[in-house]
């Protein structure tokens, strides 16, 4: 009877103690949600008090058996063979975290079984009360096994695994029973061993070792290359991607944080640092062969990929072969730095308890190491500052002589509407001519710049671009509605779609994303329209002055300079010239504000950040602030202001084209309409810029300078007040309506 009781405490029932369930339990039999061990009902010689005590004691045997079944099932590695044979037959997904938990449970059960053995030896050697001795020897396990049983029952029913399992164990650690707390902490320690191994794989080697999707760093759906069970599939997928393309995809959209698997005691900030560090190590471990071949300083010496002792042998690392070139992979992430990362993780792994502060400090240190070496790669080796300067030269029009020459060479072409099929090829001729005249051979970045002419949608009608010369009588007969229609059709210029592309090579794609380049392009198209408008106003000066001097010389020879017609023409000329001067004044000050107060000042701020910072993540943030400041301080993020500025530039172009296509400034009606619209828009612009909406923004310091230049003699302020009047006389050119 003694041995049957002891066997029941180890999970084996018999005649005295029976199991209400079938004894033929398979590995897949679910855990029972209630104790099924009980004393046989036909045993009548046991006192009710002893029966009650025995039934209480044998519950430990039931808990032991269920815990042992859970451990055996979780530690069973037969799924490896069955997965290779037929993956579809695996109904239950394996879990390395459950296996780690099972290892911890086995340790606790080993202590329990040794206690049973000690009780047996004690009872056989001495004459002692059986039930009292058993109860006294196993008393501490009544506070351990039932909570552990409830734990595995919850895990089985909820299919809890991975980070969710760590989170559950961490919550269970907060209890008032010291023995139970110690056991749960030991189980959590086993789970953390798996997590630290995965962290080592990710943060030392840059490889995601997570076959069962339990790590809080995971691949995006549809991009699971490393976790594929077939090595042939890995080779096929990697062969389709170049190193640069693969690292680009990995960096921007290859990996993400799985919130379901992120333990609550690991903050999101720390998880993001882990994600960044692993991605950075991937970049440093897998450089582009073309990038390696650019550096001839180092001797060409083939070297094996280093193994990190302490974690080697745990992971099946697969790497693409690196071409034997000048620069070595080890130069990007030195072995000493990899050892430093490994030692930090080993210190955490060997600690008996999880200390949140120590964990966060270690992650921050590893993130700083990765960011520093990534900074060294991108900023120093890849010459980031040179590329930033090139983007400033070409996308922000810092090379003004080049774009001035380009616009002059393409001026006649841009008077015609772009042709859908040949617009880009047509622009390449003036683009190449401008480069030959202004770009020196020492500019190694110009080869990365290419001109593009994407689809521009609405085509500008040639009749609107080349305004036919009309008689004054016909011009006076144009109605306001027809002028308005012409202006609305004119508002879309196909050449506004001119775009630049910049060729980005590994590893600069980590810094210059498509979003960043699109923001540069947005500013470029705006600045090019502005410079084109300024050039047309300047060309108008030269053209009209040449025309005026020719007429003046001709009239002087014929003594007509005092005639009423000549005086009337001079009045029209002066009135037109005042409008042109107002346009040029606004455009010139706007361009000076953008180039000097905005671009140059923000560029100097960015340069100081680049010199002071040695952290890649900080540098990305500084560059984003730089671009945001460019867009906000040029008002591209305010729809109302940007629309007014676009309208002003198009009115200026209309004004120039109308005058250049007229003799003696005869088309007075359309010029009056353009002048009136320009006054409205320029005064509206000044009113908006002075509004309280912009007063408290980061635009304020430089915006005040711009407003000071515009309103130097209070002209804009006085005219803006006139615009606010309900009834305002239509501005006319003096002398134009006397006819």
Curated annotation (Swiss-Prot):
Gene Ontology CC: one annotated term: spindle pole
Biological process, per Gene Ontology: microtubule nucleation
Disulfide bonds: none
Gene Ontology terms, MF aspect: gamma-tubulin binding
Transmembrane helix in keyword set: no
This protein's UniProt keywords: Cytoplasm, Cytoskeleton, Microtubule
Compartments it resides in: Cytoplasm, Cytoskeleton, Microtubule organizing center
Role played: Gamma-tubulin complex is necessary for microtubule nucleation at the microtubule organizing centers (MTOCs).
Family: Belongs to the TUBGCP family.
Protein name (Swiss-Prot/TrEMBL): Gamma-tubulin complex component 4 homolog
Source organism of this protein record: Medicago truncatula (Barrel medic)
């Amino acid at each position: 009877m003694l041995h049957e009781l002891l066997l029941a405490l180890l999970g084996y029932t018999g005649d005295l103690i029976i199991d209400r369930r079938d004894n033929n339990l398979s590995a897949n039999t679910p855990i029972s949600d209630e104790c099924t061990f009980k004393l046989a009902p036909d045993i009548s010689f046991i006192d009710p008090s002893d029966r009650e005590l025995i039934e209480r004691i044998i519950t430990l045997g039931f808990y032991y058996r269920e815990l042992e079944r859970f451990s055996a099932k979780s530690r069973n590695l037969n799924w490896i063979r069955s997965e290779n044979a037929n993956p579809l037959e695996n109904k239950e997904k394996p879990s390395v975290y459950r296996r780690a938990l099972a290892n911890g449970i086995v340790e606790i059960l080993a202590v329990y079984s040794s206690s049973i053995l000690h009780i047996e030896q004690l009872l056989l050697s001495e004459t002692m009360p059986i039930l009292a001795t058993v109860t006294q020897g196993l008393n501490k396990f009544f506070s351990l096994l039932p909570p552990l049983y409830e734990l595995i029952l919850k895990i089985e029913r909820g299919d809890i695994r991975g980070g969710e399992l760590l989170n559950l164990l961490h919550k269970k650690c907060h209890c008032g029973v010291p023995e139970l707390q110690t056991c749960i902490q030991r189980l959590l320690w086993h789970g953390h061993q798996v997590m630290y191994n995965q962290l080592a794989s990710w943060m030392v080697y840059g490889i995601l070792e997570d076959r069962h999707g339990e790590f809080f760093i995971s691949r995006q759906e549809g991009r699971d290359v490393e976790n594929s069970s077939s090595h042939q599939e890995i080779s096929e997928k990697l062969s389709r991607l170049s190193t640069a393309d693969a690292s680009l995809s990995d960096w921007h959209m290859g990996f993400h944080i799985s919130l379901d698997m992120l333990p609550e005691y690991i903050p999101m900030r720390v998880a993001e640092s882990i994600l960044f560090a692993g991605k950075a190590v991937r970049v440093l471990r897998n450089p582009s062969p073309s990038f390696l071949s650019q550096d001839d300083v180092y001797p060409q010496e083939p070297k094996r990929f280093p193994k990190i002792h302490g974690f080697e042998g745990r992971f099946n690392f697969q790497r693409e072969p690196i071409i034997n070139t000048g620069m070595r992979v080890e130069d990007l992430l030195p072995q000493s730095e990899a050892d430093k990362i490994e030692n930090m993780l080993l210190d955490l792994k060997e600690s008996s308890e999880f200390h949140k502060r120590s964990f966060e400090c270690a992650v921050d240190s590893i993130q700083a190491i990765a960011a520093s070496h990534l900074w060294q790669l991108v900023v120093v080796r890849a010459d980031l500052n040179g590329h930033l300067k090139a983007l400033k030269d070409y996308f922000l029009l810092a090379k003004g002589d080049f774009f001035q020459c380009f616009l002059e060479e393409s001026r006649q072409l841009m008077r015609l509407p772009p042709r859908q099929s040949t617009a880009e090829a047509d622009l390449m001729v003036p683009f190449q001519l401008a480069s030959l005249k202004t770009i020196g051979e020492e500019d190694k970045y110009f080869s990365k710049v290419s001109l593009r002419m994407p689809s521009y949608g609405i085509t500008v009608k040639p009749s609107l671009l080349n305004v036919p010369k009309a008689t004054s009588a016909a011009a006076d007969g144009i109605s306001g509605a027809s002028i308005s229609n012409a202006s609305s059709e004119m508002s879309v210029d196909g050449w506004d779609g001119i775009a630049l592309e910049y060729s980005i090579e590994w590893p600069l794609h980590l810094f210059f994303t498509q979003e960043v380049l699109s923001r540069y392009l947005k500013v470029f198209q705006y600045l090019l329209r502005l410079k084109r408008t300024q050039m047309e106003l300047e060309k108008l000066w030269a053209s009209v002055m040449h025309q005026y001097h020719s007429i003046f010389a001709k009239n002087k020879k014929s003594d007509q300079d005092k005639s009423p017609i000549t005086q009337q023409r001079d009045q029209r000329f002066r009135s037109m010239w005042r409008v042109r001067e107002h346009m040029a004044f606004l455009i010139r000050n706007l361009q000076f504000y953008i180039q000097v107060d905005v671009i140059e000042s923000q560029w100097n701020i960015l340069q100081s950040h680049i010199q002071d910072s040695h952290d890649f993540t900080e540098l990305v943030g500084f560059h984003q602030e730089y671009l945001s400041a460019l867009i906000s301080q040029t008002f591209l993020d305010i729809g109302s202001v940007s629309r007014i500025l676009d309208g002003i530039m198009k009115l200026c172009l209309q004004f120039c084209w109308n005058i250049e296509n007229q003799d003696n400034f005869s088309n007075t009606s359309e010029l009056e309409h353009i002048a009136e619209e320009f006054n409205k828009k320029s005064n509206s612009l000044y009113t908006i810029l002075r509004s309280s909406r912009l007063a408290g923004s980061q635009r304020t310091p430089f915006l005040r300078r711009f407003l000071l230049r515009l309103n130097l003699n209070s002209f804009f302020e006085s005219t803006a007040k006139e615009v606010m009047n309900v009834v305002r006389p239509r501005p006319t050119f003096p002398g134009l309506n006397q006819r």
